[in-house]
Amino acid sequence: MTSRIRRREFLAGLGAGLGAGLFARPAIVRAEGPVVIRAGALKLIHSIAPYFYDQFVPAGYKIEVLPFETPTECKNAVVTKSVDFGAFGIAAAVLGAAAGEPVVVIASTCNRGMAIIAKKDAGIAAIKDLKGKRVAVFPGTTQEVFFLERLRMEGMTIKDVEPVRVSFSEMHIALSRGDIDAYVGAEPGPGVSLSSGVGTLVEYPYSTAMGSLNMVFGTHRDVITQKPELVRVMLGIHQRATDYAATNKDAMVAMASSKLGQKKEAIEASVPNVELTWKLEAKQIEQSKIYADHMLALKQIKRLPDFATFIDTSFVDAVKPT
């Protein structure tokens, strides 16, 4: 009798165990996908480093590069967290920070990359020759502030020229059509105008106290406080990609031709006027402050940014040379 009970209990227990095995939800081990980093870039040659990012992404991460037409659009994408990081002009960064937006500059992207170009045979050889001429200037950009300062240095103001609002990508075309007499542009536009013979160089506007400061690399303040490791990873990628592009001109030209849709000759004409860099040193910070002072004097901003929080060099300072 006892053996029957034990046998019955054993079979019942076995059935219960099988039932549990059949109906219980199995434990599924899911492999986590890579961490996706979204980076904004501009359709300009001095924003070409982001297109090399994917060559330097460490294991466990994936990079997505999103192109933007204007610096303000890229900066706004950072502010709204549409991207995690972005490359844009110092002007867009200062405008945002002065308005209280949580944008933080954590590295540099490029110096130089600007030029004042005139229509060939238009008799424009210097800034003073622009008086009364139609000059394309894109408002709210780094180039605009440099141009206004160069006018001031020559005893002129914006009222001495006829400013025409034209985006960087359209300036060469407008010059070719005769819609404008000159423009204050961003590479590769000037390189296209010079290599095609349509334009002539008036000057590279780097003689001001702002030097050749141009593009910076920024993120949202929340990314710094909540994801500092992500910032460190991104800075490592940015540093390696920037150094690679800066020291491999052929690769830089090929990438720019592919991504920007310009002829090799035009890109080659632009490269000498582009200084790719990730370093954010005391000189660049001082130039940024001078730049912000100019924007305040021009009433483009109502107050200066708080530079104690606007620029954070801690991540760049921690990057080890490769």
Where in the sequence are the language-model features?
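N-terminal secretory signal peptides and thylakoid transit peptides that target proteins
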Residues: 1-18
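Hydrophobic h-region of N-terminal signal peptides that target proteins for export
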Residues: 20-23
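Sec/Tat signal peptide C-region and signal peptidase I cleavage site
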Residues: 25-30
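Short, glycine-/small- and polar/acidic-enriched structural segments
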Residues: 32-157, 162-168, 181-188, 198-204, ...
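Solvent-exposed, polar/charged alpha-helical surfaces in well-ordered, non-transmembrane soluble domains
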Residues: 76, 80, 94, 128, ...
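Pocket-lining segment of extracytoplasmic ligand-binding domains
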Residues: 91-92, 169-258
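Secondary-structure end/capping motifs
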Residues: 225-302
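Conserved C-terminal helix/tail region of periplasmic/extracytoplasmic solute-binding proteins
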Residues: 296-322
